[in-house]
Amino acid sequence: NKGKTFTSKYVIMTSNTETPVKPTSRRAGAFYRRVMIVDVTNNAVEKWKSDNPGKAVPKWCFNKDFSHLSLSLRGTEAYCKEYVLDPTGRNHQSRRAPPPQQVTLEQLAQKMVVQHTTNTSEFVTQAGDVPVFGFVCQNNEIDTVYNLLAAVKARYGANFNLYKGMVRTAHENSGCGAHVHVISREDNFRGKVFTVSRSRLESVPHLEGDSFRRSLGVVMSDKDVTTMFYYIKGKVINDQVNLTELPANQHVVTVHTVYDMAWALRRHLKWSGQWQLIKAAFEIMCYPDAAACALRNWMDSTDFSEEHVVTQFIAPGGTIILESCHGARMWATGKRLIRAGGITEAGGPQGGVRFAGLGARNVPWSEILREFMTLISHIWSQIKGATVVLTALTFYLKRFRPRIEAKGKNKNKGARKNTGVALTDDEYDEWRQYRTEKNLDLTVEDFLQLRHRAAMGADDSDAVKFRCWYSERQRNYHDLEDVTIIGRGGVKRELIRKGPLRPRGNDYYDEPDDWYSEGVIDGVAHKNAIVSVDDVDGMHKGYAIHIGHGVYISLKHVVSGNARILSEEPKNLTFTGELATFRLNNILPTAVPVGTSKPIKDPWGNPVSTDWQFKNYNTTSGNIYGACGSSCSLTRQGDCGLPYVDDHGVVVGLHAGSGGDKCPSRKLIVPYAKVDMRVRDTCTKQCYKDNSPTISYKGLLVKETGEPRTIMKGTRLHVSPAHTDDYEECTHQPASLGAGDPRCPISLTGIMVNNLQPYTEASPGPDTATLNRVSKMLTSHMEGYVQKSQTEEGYGSAFYMLNHDTSCGPYIGGRKKDHVKDGVLDKNLLDLLSSKWNRAKLGLALPHEYALGLKDELRPKDKVAVGKRRLIWGCDVGVSTVCRAAFKRVSESIMANHALGFIQVGINMDGPAVEDLFKRLERPKHDRYCVDYSKWDSTQPPKVTSQSIDILRHFTDKSPIVDSACATLKSNPIGIFNGVAFKVAGGLPSGMPLTSIINSLNHCLMVGSAVVKALEDSGVQVSWNIFDSMDLFTYGDDGVYIVPPLISSVMPNVFANLKQFGLKPTRTDKSDAEITPIPADEPVEFLKRTIVRTENGIRALLDRSSIIRQFYYIKAENTENWTIPPKKIDTPSRGQQLYNACLYASQHGEEFYTNKIIPLVQRAIEFEGLHIEVPEFHHAVAAYNGYFNGTEGQPNQIAFASGGLGLSSEVFEN
């Protein structure tokens, strides 16, 4: 066999040499570790040869079934029958070999199968060690002891596996019991050993109490007996009930009161786990029809006691039998079933009265002490246990009890009694529906009392009627259908759930059906698009994910066999390696985006590390082609099929296994591969085509669109006729106009390409683990003032909330108002919005494309000289409409509460809100840092943006429209210009919907991550919400940080961390000096404003140069020569602009106003033909104060200014 490669599972070699490899060989240790050696003899042949020398062996010495052979399995590393290898390699005859183990041919074959499965499984599910017991007896007593244990197993319905000898043939699946071996004294057994002193097989009727221990004469504690008889590995749920397999009941409980439920469940738990039953009891109290599902979910995450307890629950929705001992088994059925019988504690295998038993037996001292302590604490535990459970339940009920809310003047003084009750949305709907259907004049207070009486199990007629009505309502809500099934088992009626239950959420606002998911645990990404895959008998196998249009993906070993998804078989099942793609008639209301990049998060949002290199791995389900990763999440059986996502939140792989007990952090990930399922897409408008060739365009990798879209030339900014001679004195000029501009001859295309270069690479951002922690902290902080919101129902109302003066995006030319006439949308816009909305309703991502342009604005002269000009990202009107429908109310809530939070979007810097900022700036013993950032938009890490969008989603109703908006905004933006489409690798487009809020959330997340990292690098473990210790003002890239001394001491490290994240923090004056705290006697600058205290109060002063340049330039018709004054001036608008400039200038003092502003105004009136009077200084101050305090209406250019700056955003953006 030299040179041959063995490819079979099992290799059997025969040899006539007792020692195939000499013990002195270098390869002896490696060889004997890898083989099992069986010595084969034929006793009949040897005896014949001994008794009849020289005669032929007769045929009767051989049998066709090989039963004539005697098989002796050697111990590990036994190179001969007498000795094993010496680990030191010095004297190989110094260690005697253990006696060989006698096995049968069937046992040897089964041992080979078990050994092969164990050795070849790189990825397995986690499981605990199963207890092993051995009963040592004489060789002639093995059959007697085996039969006695088999009889006692049948008598008590035990769960253990019984074997003769050392060979174990049963697999350790969930629900299996302990391993019990009947062995001889020669066997080298590892486990708990009990020596049999006598063996007397008694009749089955006499196998009561301690009889099996007396019959065997073993010294064995009651705890060991319980573990041996009733140990259960893991947790298993059986929906198919077989009466012959059910354990005998110890307790029967009818589910109608909380006390009975709490008392029954208490028996199954340890003291450390009894608190977990409180929530289960409350849920069953409120939703009795869901008792079976609630118990399944509760059992899945509960630690059970080491005592053996069997309880039968009789609920309105069915019957549940729960057996627990270390693990648990449960049988659930929709029928009314009473399991007869019941082995009492006195009649169990542990025996009857402990110290006064009729039969004497040997009791170990540990057992005597344990029984004594149990006897002492018996009465006290009965009283104290009930008290603790009911006390905790009382607190739990008080937590969910509706509270009355004060109004008006009593808002902050507590609620007055009898002033009303605040209902939840569900309770309000129930009250209205019950009152309408029953035609009752029922008040809210009466309804709540009736609801709680019914939930607590009251038996009066009103409570009984309400329970019946509520059960029917819940059944309709879960889309249950009462059907008649005719099969081999006869005719039966069952409740079939037609709609899927959503995965469980960790939110008190979730619907009750969210509490009873059948597998997906809390925190799984894209849980609305995940559905359970079940076996034909209802057992959970794994998960499938909806990727749109009724197409699902899962794993081959999950959907193999008789798998059912949403109560139907998969159709058009296609396998790509281990990945399974199929169709279903039942389509989930939302879907997930899929891609082929590298994952950074596991299904629970924890960071995953992987080289993303694929090969075949041996698993318990065969060879699987995938990649190996590492994650801190603990997985379990049934998690296969859950998604791994990249930094954009796109599903790129599915969970296929873990490293088991040896390496639980090791994960096997199956990558996504695209399969053509002949899906007809619902969205026709898209410029970037994946199947079109990629070309290089002026150094950028782009795809051709076939539709040339040129960059707009010229500018609408003109020099004022009052300053044709001295405009060079102004610090700003219109941005570069392209190749013909003598100030900077770079073409507009060149400027565009230069601006897009930073978007070709993504910034690294914070590490995923820290980012996840800080995201939870920020979400928790915002929950105090941001409320949950609902999605807009139609695209019409969402569209009319948009700014109609902005671009329609890459698919339709012009502005939005150009396509609306008398409030009616034209056909082009209507068709586009309709197609986008129909796709968004399916939860699918929209094409994330923008029309690119260059901003027409004033720029500092030094930036004009080098051709620096900012980009305009014109968002698709369809994407804007969908995002407005999804997040409009959330954004309004954040903007309305800017005084309470960190995000200052929506603040009016020319109003009393500035006073609130000033108060927050004056926190004692805190340092203040003013920070600005260079190239903020292009340095935004995609994973941080994705996390910010998830925070916004947290405060929505998580509808398919929201899922579509999130998937769209998380995807890579596409920029369209000059007939090409450029895909952004990293960064945040300035024209993206909610760009100011998302930028501000990014700002908070990265500053928080930098602070946490700096503190922990310094040895301070951050175990609190970091946002409770600091205050922030963020508006996009502008930031002010108010931090305590602890954080201030590590601020240099914070800014260093921000640079590692890819950001470029600078001082507000853009200098290269180190960022230092602002002294207490110096003003703080925020949003281009200086916040100071003046004689008129707290004011946010606009920069003087920003005010002065208002007089130098006028916005008019488009031109290539901006140095020539415009032909026509809109004098009313221009007069209002300069009047506003006077008001802002008045806040800088009379000297500046009189010496600088009044001459500029007078000259503008003279040369521009304006019809305004120069406001006197005190009049200007009084007018601004009136606007500030809200006593006078604000002019248009103040009221409609963007960015909170207070002046025209078109001219005054820097």
Curated annotation (Swiss-Prot):
Domain RdRp catalytic as annotated: residue spans: 926-1051
Catalytic residues in the record: H557 (for 3clpro activity), E578 (for 3clpro activity), C640 (for 3clpro activity)
Source organism: San Miguel sea lion virus serotype 4 (SMSV-4)
Modified positions (O-(5'-phospho-RNA)-tyrosine) in chain numbering: Y428
Keywords assigned: ATP-binding, Covalent protein-RNA linkage, Hydrolase, Nucleotide-binding, Nucleotidyltransferase, Phosphoprotein, Protease, RNA-directed RNA polymerase, Thiol protease, Transferase, Viral RNA replication
Record domain SF3 helicase: where: 1-55
Catalysed transformations (reactions): a ribonucleoside 5'-triphosphate + H2O = a ribonucleoside 5'-diphosphate + phosphate + H(+); RNA(n) + a ribonucleoside 5'-triphosphate = RNA(n+1) + diphosphate; Endopeptidase with a preference for cleavage when the P1 position is occupied by Glu-|-Xaa and the P1' position is occupied by Gly-|-Yaa
Known role: NTPase presumably plays a role in replication. Despite having similarities with helicases, does not seem to display any helicase activity. Viral genome-linked protein is covalently linked to the 5'-end of the positive-strand, negative-strand genomic RNAs and subgenomic RNA. Acts as a genome-linked replication primer. May recruit ribosome to viral RNA thereby promoting viral proteins translation.
Name of protein: Genome polyprotein
PTM statement from Swiss-Prot or TrEMBL: Specific enzymatic cleavages in vivo yield mature proteins. Pro-Pol is first autocatalytically cleaved, then processes the whole polyprotein. VPg is uridylylated by the polymerase and is covalently attached to the 5'-end of the polyadenylated genomic and subgenomic RNAs. This uridylylated form acts as a nucleotide-peptide primer for the polymerase.
Top-rank lineage group of the source organism: Viruses
One GO molecular-function entry: ATP binding
